[in-house]
């Protein structure tokens, strides 16, 4: 067989992951994942991160120890080539590392890149994210599909939404949709895309009993929103333990300036 | 236009942030912020730190990843030049980094420098600070404006107050005022200044659902008081979870020596 | 006497622990233990790790500070020579470090190597493991001998069992047997072996009020399963504090694909 | 005046703190304190550590940031010279750093060295130690003066007592006396010494609402016992939150071997 995939795998385009620039995606993904490991976000090979640079998408492989990843471990995929693929489940890798399998998170990362034009997508298994979805579960169907919190300063760390300028305000209510987990991570894709359609301004989707996907225009925005969200999830769990509500009705004490 | 600001921005005084001394403010702010990031104080670009050296004030920009800051990212401002500005909200920067915006915390840091002659001011979004203000909120208006704790050894980490020598004693009650958060961080300034007037001896002000501002005569004192305060906030939350009161009436068992 | 043991101890085979390869077991055990110390798994000389490479078993000594261990501190033992020993409690070391005693965990590590053909075995004193056994203890005899959790994504981090390919699924229930602690760690061995016989697919055994033993085909698998398990133990304790059950009956929302 | 103190201060014996050996006390105290800072044991200049080498005692100064200490900051004192001093509160320093004051912990460290022949003494302000003393306080006078825990493996990390060989067993009950805090740290000395007399086998004394002092024959033993104790304090607080008792009556399941 002589498909582009096979050809590319043969000469394998190793130059795509070789750079002395610490901000090159192939260097940045391992550095980010090592940092995320210390935060408990990518424990035991769970979770991960992907970066898009124009048409190219850089992806960590399946099942690696995230704090030990190397640039040589990174997959590279072309969005344009992928779009031309007849089978949506078939990936067209420009570069594949030896001895690895692609991550099951790949179609979820691609959804953020193609539907939201994101430059980076992070997936964590953070305890706080999982606990928030478990706490919501006890509130009965209907109320359990949305995490809401307001009147916390850290909410300002979020943009107003895709294609909108500016960030949320202190009195705004941050809403993060929750989707149910599926037996196979790839099967989450359609539910993630549905949530993106229903919540066009969200930069994150919680996955019940699993974790969270967070994306942003670039690495900086995806990472800082992921940190802010994890902060809010942790705070929400601690508030629950102290019997404090996540949403309150506080009147602005000072008129909001434009 | 030919104002000093524009002139200064043109030649930009980069020498003000270039030093091989690790204790130079332009080197120290990034080092401190990297350390604070590991403590969870400046998650997701929240929080920050500012240092004053005689007339010059060194400030981190808005929206940066605090653990990745570099000396080149630092703003420098002259207190004397600022005092002559007709518009209090207009900042007169001697040096501005490219591609950044000044931090909204700037007027709050300046309040500590001008009203308290502080040499350093730290602003954290620590969970423990936020949780303490949330717990106080449940105690009803009137009781919710002051964090109080006594009979804990770590209280000795605080000075007696601005212009006074010596530290608090074990049996003294540490009181930290709480101000309400505002939609825009700059609008906090007048409330912070009010709290400084009402509590002339305090080295810190809590901001409801937001975090804490802590200052001191120099970096050493601001940092160690901020650590001691965060320790006490964490202890207070843990005491609350265990049903233990923050203020107790313990008689000294040994006569206090002078 | 002129036994192989004595001979080997005399010339002591130091070459067995000298390698410039960071993945050599004598280098890897100290690096792993330093990492585990930061996770709170091997506090105060407790816990440890052992690696098997073909016939050779590499072991940390008793009572060392795990974050300060050096390759020179490592014991080496031959499984073949050990199998020929008449006294099962007598160890036949090819290489012994000066000034140390062998670890009491040795026979437990050997059980994982000989009965499960493991390539690595990790023993932690993690708080979360101990707390899980304490919580189970309150559920009465009969129910206290097995930790069970299901419908959490991280469960997928576990293999289906010794000699089976593939990992557990999201809806599978992870079961970890609990054995009672004994006054002497060596006396745990027979109970650990019994649990291995009763739970042929398990990769871990909890020890009541003590910690956990986790093994795997190689270092990668043992370490990532140990991380996943610690994540689940922590989650289980947090779920208990929030009144959430560890085992739930959730129907798959999407047909499971083969 | 021409006392030995003054003389020694003049030539100041800087050689006593200058060594290229990382295990020299003047190098080891800063390294240990930096590690303890990351554990939350010496937050905000609280806590510290002292090492004795034969007649010489090495001490950190008062009020320093413990993670930034340098060998040049260390005080050195002679036990023999100290013993000849007429005023017990007067310290006879062989070497004093410039611009510092001696630590108020000094007489407490000296008590461990002179009354227990310790080689190292560590003082932490760990949250867990403070919380344990607060929890005990709620149990009423009489029951509040002793922390007790048993049937936890980590108890084996403690020696049987001063001058005795071997460690505690799994079924032994670890008992740590609690003394009341005093307004001045130096005033704790007599109560610490009383507790040492009443509990001749203990290697630690808790100080109510303050922290813990832990000592050992050498640095290794003091540090690992301090780690084990902090582990047990943390576990005890977590057990309290889960409603689990610290002391239980478990019969050995296997006959204890000699």
Swiss-Prot record, chains A, B, C, D:
Could you tell me the superkingdom of the organism this chain comes from? Eukaryota
UniProt cofactor(s): Zn(2+)
Its predominant location is: cytoplasm
* Protein keywords: Amino-acid biosynthesis, Cytoplasm, Lyase, Metal-binding, Methionine biosynthesis, Zinc
Q: Which SUPFAM superfamilies match?
A: AraD/HMP-PK domain-like
Q: Could you confirm whether the keyword Amino-acid biosynthesis appears in this record?
A: yes
Top-level class of the enzyme under EC nomenclature: lyase
**Active-site residues, as the UniProt record annotates them:** 153
The EC number(s) given in the record are 4.2.1.109
**Binding note for cofactor:** Binds 1 zinc ion per subunit.
Disulfide cysteine pairs (residue numbers): none
Catalytically driven reaction(s): 5-(methylsulfanyl)-D-ribulose 1-phosphate = 5-methylsulfanyl-2,3-dioxopentyl phosphate + H2O
Could you give a GO molecular-function term held by this entry?
A: methylthioribulose 1-phosphate dehydratase activity
Its localization reads: Cytoplasm
Checking NCBIfam families in the record gives: salvage_mtnB
Q: What does this protein do?
A: Catalyzes the dehydration of methylthioribulose-1-phosphate (MTRu-1-P) into 2,3-diketo-5-methylthiopentyl-1-phosphate (DK-MTP-1-P).
**PANTHER family to which the protein is assigned, alphabetical:** METHYLTHIORIBULOSE-1-PHOSPHATE DEHYDRATASE (PTHR10640:SF7)
Name-wise, this protein is: Methylthioribulose-1-phosphate dehydratase
The organism encoding this protein is: Neurospora crassa (strain ATCC 24698 / 74-OR23-1A / CBS 708.71 / DSM 1257 / FGSC 987)
